[in-house]
């Protein structure tokens, strides 16, 4: 076929501009284009190279002219073409292709298809017009179009007007077929014949509007189908005749058509493919029909990607190309790997939120570059045959011409070859070029020598002048210029003389050869012979010269036969070189030969004969001497060659002279005729004058004089004209002379310019080569660096994989060890009592317990036989597989030891198969881990992008607020400045998020490169190298692995269902308990208004309207208790815990109902509830003041909160392993019928230290930071029935060595206490239970509870000047007025807003996150005067003026969140603020009289701590700082320097610092619960005491006591014991109860009746308990 060839699919990348929405949301551009190179960079350093790359500012016209214009021109030559637009949804594919006609577009915004249509019809008109101008038959064109839509894998015809647009899901009748040549065509498709551009545009618009589009979250008008617009072009034109045929065969001029006109038919089709965008359902938000469309689109694109991967496989491993997997790939089979010129335009988005889609699109397009198409011209068979024959004729004609010209010859053996003349000509041309180079080099050497001579002569002249004493630089320069000019003139003079001599000799030769040329003078025929005679003579001379030349050629042939050919070539070259040096002798010989030719021809003939005979004689004489013979031959041959050349030159000159003679002849004849006419006119004038003179009758003297004067005047005028003409002639001669000189100079300058250009070209070429070499070296180095980086990443990845594998193995080993130990315990013999207890089975166990027990037993049994059975099964399979017969089993089914024969082949087989399976397993693990990593990184990037969008919206709102404030009150500088600061903070956060997004993108790119490396090691190599037996073994392993994974999934699902069932059951139990409690309290509340008010508050807070309402919430206590009940498998535990906890709670309530009436004089609800303190049952009493029982009772009356979550303690308690249950089961606790002792629960365990790097904590979100991590996922009830009380504690004997003595303990909070503040009369505490309590230190009672906080209360302060209490929770500061029933009067926010009243009153559940634009407040401090409030929020401290409740400034300078601060006053009554942050630094801020705006730190204390700062304390000029690095530092505020530091002051975080009242002693408390006393002066320890079993969160003092708040929900009051020496720490035992018993005795037990059947809650009327 004509024009066959391979061409690769070209790929262009277009980066669309950012949308306004993306700019508003703060999306950054993650792509960049290398200037001048078709390369696009994604992220930081991931580069992709394509054929074309178009950046953001590229116009439609540029894309079309660069990519598609050549394809349209190719269609006119019969080549198919395809343009594909690929990319994600909203990347600009439809806009680029130009199929979106839903809006009016300008001409500049027209896409590829409208421009291609215009180009097509413009080309048709141009070709018709060109043919008309040449006068040949114009081509005929036929254009047709089709428009197909692939919707949900169904082909729809968009030109079919009869199709129902709503019936898209019906099957269409369009079929795809393949012709004999592999071309794809469709049947059942409407094909419209097109006659004009407007008609085709209208068809395109009609089809585009019929295309399926819909709206998604990513694009308002999203294409929901693939569209293929096809243009078919059929062209019939006159066959183009080759130039060789026109000139040599037909004899017609080029371009003229021959008489027999032949036509050829060309066809072409052009596909314009607008693919639908690749989608992610979670980004498009598609559901229902849109989701199905997206799935279909992605399936088609996946099939297209598989085809591209198969075609672009460089290793050529893929034999089958899956074209039939999708109708899309079937339709595009021509375009991908077939007969088509294809270009793919990949449209991508530059925004970083589309990073993954952009990366996938670029990788997709990069694979398409490797596809090679086989492009041929689509001709009919007749035209193809004619073209082939015409090409054959042209080739034969060219070969014939070469034979005629002597270029080709036929050897004796019949082989073709080139003639000697052709080879000689080529050799001479090469030699001529070498001589030219030599002449050029010599000329340069001459110029250099001339410059050197000039320089030397000038130096000589300068020396002479210097000796004469007249030396001067100007004179020397002038002399040098003169000498240079003299040398140049001398050189030109020599050249002119040589040229003059050459011309003179040429003229003498011409005059000697052509004596008749003198007769052709302008004098006319009178001075020579006739012109005809001279012409005949010249012709005769030429004829004779040609004869002479033929004779010499024959002589040379004879000589050549006698001399070897090789030596002749060498001698001729040598003689020609010598000939150039002996010019004078040759010229003399030429003159003699010319004279001989022009003088006497007969004598010349005789001389020639004599020369021939002489040469023959010399040849005969030289036969005796071979060397002389050879030399003579070569000399004669060279002479003949030179003579032939001279004769040839003479003949050429004669012919030229002949032509010049003819020209002169014509000129002289014309001039002669002109002169003859002039003579004739003069004679006529003379005759006329004579006639007039004769006829004159009266001739007077006067008239004669007049005539004479006229003639003289005319003569003078003619003489004057003659002089002018002569002057003009001289001027003309001078100009001609100057012109020749100018021409010589011009030629010389042109030659110099040409040489300079050549030198420039050589230098440019050298520079380009050097640059290319440097680029190659740099590319190689970069490739090596990238390879090393990849190797490093691969090794790191392998290390991580090995570490993970090791951890997994350790976990599996630990689990197996536990199973083995459990099985061993099961195998131990049991006592009869235990065995009997095991035999007992509870009659009605709940479903959860049954499932748990069955699961446990099945796990135990399966664990006992899992290892051995798997090993036996595996051995049997291997034995059966290898052909070994198993031996008999002995000892109850245990296989006996087999005697295997030694078979090296089987051993090697098993080892090779095992190695292959291990390699495949490692590969699978690597792929899974890598994909998990990529998915996690994508999730992180999406989360960061969403966070950035939120911050941008907030920033935009603040900007609008600032603009509004500027417009309304421009003088409000304070508010504007605060808004500007907040905007700056948001901008900093956005920059940090952008950096994090960039890091995620870089990591994803690195992982993708590693993924490509893993993909390169294809598992098909391992699988293809397997034998049949190995393949079976691998298949068996895969089957086992899949079964194991399925089993794990089923177990996880069963666990989830079990937990869901427990959750529902707990929900129902809690609901019923709450209803019963409310009903019981309502009955009791009829006589007690206080209880009625409490019940009303509880219902209002928790949303209970009536007892009939179904409640889905559940309490913390019921959740943990029900889990405990279900988790126990012991019979004892079941008998105790099988009775629902509701019964105990109902017993408590009923006992209260049946007890003695309350004292009527007691009106306080606290006193009324205090009657519930003593509850007796079965003759045994217990005190609710005991924290354990009090906690149980408090849970009884606590009601759930909506939206509550499971507490950590309950989650930890419920997750009891079967092993733990088995331990309790095996121990077999005895049943006690009379009493059952309880031990108080241990304190909550201390929090484990965060193992993260401290610097990573600094960069964490500031809103998540809080002092001592005071955040809890759990929630508690807002309603507390019991009020707190301060219980005095008697000092234990032998406690005299402790520096502190605990005197009282305050209890009342249900969660850890995080903060406290105290005066001499009042104590304020804040807890994780979202409440604050106010205590009366005089009476030891709780005064009020300040509730309604959104989260943990992390800081509380009391202002004695104003009587206000400030409490901090989340991002809010509540201001309480305790003088007026303790109500919240204002709410301050971290952003500086002031809200009247309680802004959190509607918050019934725990708020885990802060509001938008707010930050977590970690601590606050009051100024000593009480007029300023300093609030640490984020990495700044906001200053509030309490007189107006307005923010007036900010303290900035920290990088991390500010965790603590303290305030003191300087000598000039100015506030001095010291802050500590997570960035390890302590900063000091000294404030002046006017505090406004942003204030920077006065001093940064160096060196910093090794971790975050937790607490600060100031006494005088001494500052103490405690840190998470377990150390305390002592600073001097005056000198602003470090005095002393103790690195390990505690074994855990230093959480609180304070001073002993009235003494120079420092108190420090840590997270381990220890309190240390230090001497302030020398910073030495005085004593240590174990203050709490849980972390101590805060410490404060008043004038008498020391208060410590701990996570054990208690506040202890301490007194300092004076006069003690440093001692070892001792444990402080908290004695519970008003009448404290012995500390070592357990609390009074609670006895419950043992029932042989499960206890269910009785009806309400039967809720009776007897108190004994």
UniProtKB/Swiss-Prot annotation:
It is found in: Cytoplasm, Cytoskeleton; Cell projection, Dendrite; Cell projection, Growth cone; Cell projection, Axon. One of its GO terms (molecular function) is ATP binding. GO terms for biological process: brain development; corpus callosum development; regulation of postsynaptic membrane neurotransmitter receptor levels; retrograde dendritic transport. It comes from the Eukaryota. GO terms for cellular component: dendrite cytoplasm; glutamatergic synapse; growth cone; microtubule; postsynaptic endosome. ATP binds at residues 87-94. The keyword Transmembrane helix does not apply. Residues 847-866 have a biased composition (Low complexity). Residues 1199-1219 have a biased composition (Polar residues). Residues 401-1100 are annotated as: Interaction with TRIM3. The modification Phosphoserine is found at residues 580, 1150, 1168, 1217, 1243. WD repeats lie at residues 1308-1345, 1348-1386, 1412-1450, 1453-1495, 1504-1541, 1545-1584, 1587-1624. Disruption phenotype: Mutant mice exhibit behavioral changes involving learning and memory deficits. Residues 372-465, 924-1019 form a coiled coil. Residues 8-371 form the Kinesin motor domain. The modification Phosphothreonine is found at residues 583, 1239. Keywords: ATP-binding, Cell projection, Coiled coil, Cytoplasm, Cytoplasmic vesicle, Cytoskeleton, Microtubule, Motor protein, Nucleotide-binding, Phosphoprotein, Repeat, WD repeat. Expressed in brain (at protein level). Expressed in spleen and at lower levels in testes. Its main location: cytoplasm. Residues 579-628 have a biased composition (Acidic residues). Residues 553-629, 837-866, 1199-1253 are annotated as: Disordered. Interacts with TRIM3; the interaction positively affects motility of KIF21B. Interacts with GABARAP and GABA(A) receptor subunits: GABRG2, GABRA1 and GABRA2. May interact with GABA(A) receptor subunits: GABRB2 and GABRB3. Plus-end directed microtubule-dependent motor protein which displays processive activity. Is involved in regulation of microtubule dynamics, synapse function and neuronal morphology, including dendritic tree branching and spine formation. Plays a role in lerning and memory. Involved in delivery of gamma-aminobutyric acid (GABA(A)) receptor to cell surface. This is Kinesin-like protein KIF21B. It comes from Mus musculus (Mouse).
């Amino acid at each position: 076929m004509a024009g066959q060839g391979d061409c690769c699919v070209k790929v262009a990348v277009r980066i669309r501009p950012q949308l306004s929405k993306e700019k508003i949301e703060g999306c950054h551009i993650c792509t960049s284009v290398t200037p001048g190179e078709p390369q696009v960079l994604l992220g930081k350093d991931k580069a992709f190279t394509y054929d074309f790359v178009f950046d953001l500012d590229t116009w439609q016209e540029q894309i079309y002219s660069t990519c598609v214009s050549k394809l349209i021109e190719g269609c006119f030559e019969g080549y198919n073409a395809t343009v594909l637009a690929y990319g994600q949804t909203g990347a600009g594919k439809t806009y680029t292709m130009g199929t979106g006609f839903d809006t009016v577009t300008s001409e500049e915004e027209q896409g590829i298809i409208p421009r291609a249509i215009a180009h097509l019809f413009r080309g048709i008109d141009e070709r018709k017009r060109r043919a008309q101008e040449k006068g040949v038959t114009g081509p005929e064109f036929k254009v047709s179009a089709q428009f197909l839509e692939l919707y949900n894998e169904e082909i729809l015809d968009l030109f079919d007007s009869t199709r129902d647009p709503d019936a898209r899901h019906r099957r269409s009748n369009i079929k795809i077929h393949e012709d004999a040549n592999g071309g794809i065509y469709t049947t059942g498709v409407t094909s419209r014949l097109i006659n004009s551009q407007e008609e085709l545009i209208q068809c395109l618009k009609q089809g585009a509007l019929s295309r399926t589009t819909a709206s998604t979250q990513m694009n308002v008008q999203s294409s929901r189908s693939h569209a293929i617009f096809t243009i078919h072009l059929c062209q019939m034109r006159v066959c183009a005749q080759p130039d060789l045929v026109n000139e040599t065969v037909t004899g017609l001029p080029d371009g003229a058509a021959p008489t027999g006109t032949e036509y050829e038919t060309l066809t072409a089709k052009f596909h314009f493919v607008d693919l639908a965008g690749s989608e992610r359902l979670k980004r498009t938000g598609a559901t229902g029909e849109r989701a199905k469309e997206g799935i279909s689109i992605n399936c088609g694109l996946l099939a297209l990607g598989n085809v591209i991967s198969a075609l672009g496989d460089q290793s050529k491993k893929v034999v089958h190309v899956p074209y039939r997997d999708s109708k899309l790939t079937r339709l595009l089979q021509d375009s991908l790997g077939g007969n088509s010129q294809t270009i793919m335009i990949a449209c991508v988005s530059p925004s970083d939120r589309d990073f993954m889609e952009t990366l996938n699109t670029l990788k997709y397009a990069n694979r398409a570059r490797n596809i090679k198409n086989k492009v041929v011209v689509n001709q009919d068979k007749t035209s193809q045959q004619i073209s082939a024959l015409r090409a054959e004729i042209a080739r034969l004609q060219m070969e014939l011409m070469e034979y005629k010209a002597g270029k080709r010859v036929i050897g004796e053996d019949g082989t073709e070859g080139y003639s000697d003349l052709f080879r000689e000509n080529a050799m001479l041309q090469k030699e001529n070029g070498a001589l030219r180079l030599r002449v050029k080099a010599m000329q340069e050497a001459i110029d250099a020598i001339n410059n050197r001579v000039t320089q030397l002569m000038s130096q000589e002249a300068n020396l002479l002048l210097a000796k004469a004493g007249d030396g001067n630089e100007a004179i020397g320069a002038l002399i040098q210029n003169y000498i240079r000019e003299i040398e140049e003139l001398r050189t030109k003079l020599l050249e002119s003389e040589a040229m003059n001599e050459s011309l003179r000799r040429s003229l003498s030769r011409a005059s000697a050869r052509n004596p008749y040329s003198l007769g052709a003078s302008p004098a006319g025929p009178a001075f020579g012979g006739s012109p005809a005679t001279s012409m005949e003579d010249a012709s005769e001379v030429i004829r004779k010269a040609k004869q002479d030349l033929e004779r010499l050629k024959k002589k040379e042939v004879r000589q050549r036969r006698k001399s070897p050919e090789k030596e002749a070539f060498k001698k001729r070259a040598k003689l020609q070189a010598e000939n150039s040096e002996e010019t004078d002798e040759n010229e003399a010989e030429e003159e003699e030969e010319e004279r001989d030719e022009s003088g006497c021809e007969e004598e010349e003939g005789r001389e020639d004969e004599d020369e021939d005979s002489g040469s023959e004689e010399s040849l005969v004489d030289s036969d005796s001497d071979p060397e002389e013979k050879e030399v003579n031959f070569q000399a004669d041959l060279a002479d003949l060659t030179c003579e032939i050349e001279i004769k040839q030159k003479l003949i050429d000159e004669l012919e030229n002279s002949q032509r010049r003679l003819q020209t002169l002849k014509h000129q002289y004849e014309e001039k002669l005729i002109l002169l003859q006419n002039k003579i004739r006119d003069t004679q006529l004038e003379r005759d006329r004058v004579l006639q007039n003179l004769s006829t004159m009758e009266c001739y007077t003297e006067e008239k004669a004089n007049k005539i004479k004067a006229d003639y003289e005047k005319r003569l003078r005028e003619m003489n004057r004209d003659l002089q002018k003409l002569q002057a003009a002639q001289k001027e003309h001669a001078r100009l001609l002379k100057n012109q020749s000189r100018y021409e010589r100079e011009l030629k010389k300058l042109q030659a110099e310019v040409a040489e300079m250009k050549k030198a420039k070209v050589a230098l440019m070429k050298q520079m380009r080569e050097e640059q290319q070499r440097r680029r190659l070296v740099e590319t190689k180095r970069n490739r090596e660096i990238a390879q090393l980086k990849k190797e490093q990443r691969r090794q790191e990845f392998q290390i991580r994989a090995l570490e993970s594998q090791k951890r997994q193995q350790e976990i599996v080993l630990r689990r197996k060890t536990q199973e083995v130990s459990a099985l061993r315990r099961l195998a131990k013999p049991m006592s009869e009592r235990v065995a009997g207890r095991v035999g007992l089975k509870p009659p009605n166990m709940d479903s959860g317990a049954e499932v748990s027990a069955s699961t446990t037993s099945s796990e135990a049994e399966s664990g006992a036989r899992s290892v051995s059975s798997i090993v036996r099964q595996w051995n049997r399979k291997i034995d059966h597989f290898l052909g070994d017969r198993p031996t008999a089993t002995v000892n109850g089914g245990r296989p006996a030891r087999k005697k295997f024969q030694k078979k090296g082949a089987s051993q090697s087989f098993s080892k090779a198969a095992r190695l292959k399976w291990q390699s495949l397993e490692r590969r699978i693990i690597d792929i899974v881990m890598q994909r998990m990593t990529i998915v996690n990184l994508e999730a992180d990037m999406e989360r960061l992008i969403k966070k950035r969008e939120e911050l941008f919206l907030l920033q935009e709102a603040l900007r609008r607020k600032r603009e509004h404030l500027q417009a309304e009150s421009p003088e409000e500088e304070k508010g504007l400045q605060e808004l500007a600061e907040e905007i700056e903070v948001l901008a900093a956060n956005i920059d940090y998020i952008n950096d994090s997004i960039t890091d995620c993108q870089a990591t994803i790119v690195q992982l993708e490169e590693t993924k490509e490396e893993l993909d390169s090691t294809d598992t098909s190599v391992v699988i293809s190298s397997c034998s049949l037996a190995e393949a079976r073994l691998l298949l068996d392993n895969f089957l086992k692995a899949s079964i194991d994974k399925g089993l794990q999934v089923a177990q996880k699902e069963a666990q989830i269902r079990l937990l869901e069932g427990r959750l529902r059951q707990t929900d129902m139990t809690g609901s019923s308990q709450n209803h019963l409690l409310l009903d019981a309290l309502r009955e009791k509340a009829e006589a007690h208004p206080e209880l009625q008010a409490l019940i009303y508050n509880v219902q209002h807070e928790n949303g209970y309207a009536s007892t009939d309402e179904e409640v889905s919430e559940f309490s913390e206590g019921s959740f943990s208790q029900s889990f405990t009940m279900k988790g126990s498998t012991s019979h004892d535990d079941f008998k105790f815990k099988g009775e629902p906890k509701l019964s105990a709670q109902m017993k408590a309530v009923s006992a209260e109902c049946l007890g003695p009436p309350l004292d009527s004089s007691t009106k306080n609800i606290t006193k009324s509830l205090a009657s519930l303190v003593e509850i007796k049952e079965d003759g045994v009493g217990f005190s609710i003041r005991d924290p354990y029982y009090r906690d149980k009772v408090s849970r009884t009356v606590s009601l759930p909160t909506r939206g509550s979550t499971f507490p950590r303690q309950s989650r930890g308690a419920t997750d009891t392993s079967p092993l733990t249950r088995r331990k309790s089961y095996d121990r077999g606790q005895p049943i006690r019928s009379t009493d059952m002792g309880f031990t108080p629960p241990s304190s909550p365990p201390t929090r484990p230290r965060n193992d993260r790097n401290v610097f990573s904590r600094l960069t964490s979100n500031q809103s998540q930071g809080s002092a001592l991590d005071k955040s809890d996922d759990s929630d508690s009830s807002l309603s507390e029935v019991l009020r707190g009380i301060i219980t005095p504690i008697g000092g234990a004997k032998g406690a005299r060595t402790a520096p502190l003595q605990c005197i009282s303990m305050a209890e009342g909070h249900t969660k850890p206490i995080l903060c406290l503040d105290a005066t001499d009369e009042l104590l304020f505490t804040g807890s994780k239970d979202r409440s604050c309590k106010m205590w009366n230190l005089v009476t030891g009672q709780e005064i009020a509870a300040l509730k309604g906080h959104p989260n943990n209360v992390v800081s509380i302060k009391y202002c004695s000047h104003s009587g206000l209490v400030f409490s901090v929770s989340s991002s809010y500061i509540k201001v309480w007025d305790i003088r007026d029933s303790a109500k919240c009067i204002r709410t301050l926010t971290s952003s500086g807003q002031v809200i009247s009243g309680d802004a959190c009153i509607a918050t019934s559940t725990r708020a885990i996150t802060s509001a938008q634009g707010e930050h977590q407040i970690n601590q606050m401090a009051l100024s000593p005067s009480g007029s300023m409030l300093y609030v640490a929020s984020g990495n700044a401290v906001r200053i509030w003026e309490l007189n107006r409740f307005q923010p007036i400034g900010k303290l900035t300078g920290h990088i991390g969140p500010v965790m603590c601060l303290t305030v003191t006053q300087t000598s000039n009554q100015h506030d001095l603020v010291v802050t500590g942050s997570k960035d390890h630094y302590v900063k000091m801020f000294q404030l002046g009289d006017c505090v406004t705006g942003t204030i920077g730190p006065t001093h940064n204390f160096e060196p910093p701590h090794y971790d975050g700062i937790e607490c600060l304390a100031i006494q005088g000029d001494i500052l103490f700082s405690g840190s998470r690095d377990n150390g305390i530092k002592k600073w001097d505020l005056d000198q602003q320097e470090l005095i002393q530091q103790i690195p390990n002051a505690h074994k855990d975080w230093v959480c609180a610092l304070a001073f002993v009242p009235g003494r120079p002693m420092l108190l420090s408390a840590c997270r381990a619960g220890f309190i240390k006393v230090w001497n302030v002066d020398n910073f030495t320890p005085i004593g240590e005491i174990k203050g709490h079993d849980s972390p101590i969160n805060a410490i404060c003092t008043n004038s008498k006591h020391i208060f410590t708040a701990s996570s054990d929900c208690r506040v202890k009051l301490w007194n300092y014991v004076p006069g003690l020496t440093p001692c070892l720490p001792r444990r402080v035992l908290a004695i519970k109860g008003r009448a404290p018993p012995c500390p070592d005795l357990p609390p009074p037990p609670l006895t419950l009746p043992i029932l042989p059947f499960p206890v269910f809650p009785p009806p309400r009327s039967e809720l009776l308990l007897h108190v004994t």
